[in-house]
């Protein structure tokens, strides 16, 4: 599911064979002038975009991350194949995922425009931010965490390593916070929710290992929070 494109340079080549979005014109005004549509009887322009779904604001489904070749609820990773996800696809919850959204503007709470890369947001940070906003995290909430990184990159116009590089984000310990608060989903304005570099070199994206296949939480990346931050 793509909620909104925020830049054409936000996807990098990686082991999953992702590529930057490709925009192709299928029909143009010059085609019309050249007489290409004379027999058709209608002059028009048309185009298409091809892109990996991780190149824009997206939900990470429960079939996105595997641990020991298993996904959420113990389903085999083999159930995600060239035909798509037979289990835990995001489309399975499209009619069920509705709830209260809670914006935790951690950057504003900390008194900064944005967090620098590598800054880990801890359980205490989330709790103190919620307290300062006079909001209580409840079971089933959709928690949105703002680091300010998206706006910083939009202002600078330099995406660099935004997709796949170092970033501020949630500390590994927040997996326990997510579990204890029984929230439904967590969203951030960074590319992968958790802090980069990771807090350990023993695992790649360890927060993902726990939150998605073990706790069963969907996550959202690349969330554009400029407007909700202004109207809060």
Name these PLM-found stretches:
Residues 1-7, 12, 224, 229-231:
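Single conserved hydrophobic/aromatic residue that forms the stacking wall/gate
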